[in-house]
UniProtKB/Swiss-Prot annotation:
ATP binds at residues 170-225. It comes from Leuconostoc mesenteroides subsp. mesenteroides (strain ATCC 8293 / DSM 20343 / BCRC 11652 / CCM 1803 / JCM 6124 / NCDO 523 / NBRC 100496 / NCIMB 8023 / NCTC 12954 / NRRL B-1118 / 37Y). The gene is ddl. Residues 140-349 form the ATP-grasp domain. This is D-alanine--D-alanine ligase. The lineage of its organism: Bacteria, Bacillati, Bacillota, Bacilli, Lactobacillales. Keywords: ATP-binding, Cell shape, Cell wall biogenesis/degradation, Cytoplasm, Ligase, Magnesium, Manganese, Metal-binding, Nucleotide-binding, Peptidoglycan synthesis.
Length: 377
């Protein structure tokens, strides 16, 4: 039986480039463990160029990346308008894309648009699901209008930010807030703010990453929860995981980039989270509701905050969850009796299923007949 060819894409130009490599290693091993697929790897360098498969294999093996990229760039025809994606031709045809590009390109819908243009199946949400979910402000608007509980927030740009003094923020949202770049992931461009000086610095930092910034209320006594969701029309939800960070060190009591990807030794993980049956049911239902409202497919991780009264608030979705050894998403499915190999096999099947379903849709056009207009008369 001929094995289907899976194009595993990793790297990218975001701050999560190195995280993507570690996720891709685990996905590669899981796909290989199924024994069902041939894997072709493509790294996207930090300059945005797809690298050929041989160079990509070296980068996946964590060889020193820059010399590999430099050598590849010497082979690039700079006059080719498609030079950035030209390397995709180097491996011949393949059956499905498996993107593992965190942050920009992978989670904002860019790659999914390319896959759709190439008329190829791919793992994960469609372009619009990624694009909407990557924009924290737009996500919160959709959650709110659909009755899915989330925290109070304000959205500002560089001009309107001048209208929101620290005193005004405190009156509206309380004296502890989080300032976040609207279009970034994994705690990049996020600051916990407790005074006017920190507020000014946080805005300046977040505006380095996006021209739209979210200012969000803090949740009193918050426990951070995570839930995995996989599937298409009838998605499955994992057990709920919880993590707590001591109020010390770089994290200041919240789950920041360092705690997620650099050193999680101080983080306490709890799988499954010790919650009442009522709260467990509510969190899982909110996760499923958000998955559908945001038009997600394939996979996602839903992050929640649980306040001191055990009321859950949906924080934000992650449409391409990390799959490193430190990632809770990976561990949640392990606990739910879906091991890595089974999980990736299901994700690939969901990708083929969604592609086949979309092929049934009609994209007909209306002819304008022989009428000629403008300069073409």
């Amino acid at each position: 039986m001929t094995k289907k060819r899976v194009a595993l894409i990793f790297g990218g130009n975001s701050s999560e480039h190195d995280v993507s490599k570690r996720s891709a290693q685990n996905f590669y091993n899981a796909i290989e463990a199924t024994g069902k697929y041939e894997i072709i790897v493509f790294a996207i360098a930090q300059n945005g160029f797809f690298l050929d498969t041989e160079s990509s294999k070296k980068i996946l093996a964590l060889e020193d990346e820059q010399p590999i990229v430099d050598a590849f760039m010497k082979t690039v025809d700079a006059s080719d308008p498609l030079a950035r994606i030209h390397a995709l031709k180097s491996a011949g045809d393949f059956d499905i894309f498996f993107p593992v590009v965190h942050g920009n390109l992978g989670e904002d819908g860019t790659l999914q648009g390319l896959f759709k243009l190439l008329d190829k199946p791919y793992v994960g949400a469609p372009l619009r699901g990624h694009a909407v979910s990557f924009d924290k402000a737009l996500t919160k608007e959709l959650l709110t209008v659909n009755g899915i509980r989330n925290t109070k927030y304000i959205v500002v740009d560089p001009e309107s930010a001048n209208n929101w003094s620290w005193d005004k923020i405190v009156a509206e949202l309380g004296n502890i807030v989080f300032v976040k770049a609207a279009n970034q992931g994994s705690s990049v461009g996020i600051s916990r703010v407790t005074n006017a000086e920190e507020y000014t610095e946080a805005l300046s930092d977040s505006f380095q990453y996006d021209y739209k910034v979210l200012i969000e209320e803090a949740v009193n006594g918050a426990r951070e929860l995570e839930v995995g969701v996989i599937g298409n029309d009838q998605p499955l939800v994992s057990e709920i995981g919880a993590h707590t960070v001591p109020n010390q060190g770089s994290g200041d009591g919240w789950y920041d980039y360092n705690n997620k990807f650099v050193d999680n030794s101080a983080v306490h993980f709890e799988i499954p989270a010790q919650l009442s049956p009522e709260v467990t049911k509510e969190v899982k239902q909110m996760a499923l509701d958000a998955y559908k409202v945001l038009n997600l497919r394939g996979e996602a991780r839903m992050d929640f905050l649980l306040d001191e009264n055990n009321v859950p608030y949906l924080g934000e979705p992650n449409t391409l969850p990390g799959f490193t050894n430190m990632s809770l998403f990976k561990r949640l499915w392990d606990y739910s009796d879906i091991n890595n190999a089974k999980l990736v096999d299901m994700l690939i099947d969901y990708g083929f299923e969604d592609f086949a379903q979309n092929k049934k849709l009609s994209y007909s056009f209306v002819s304008l007949g022989e009428e000629k207009i403008g300069k073409f008369n």
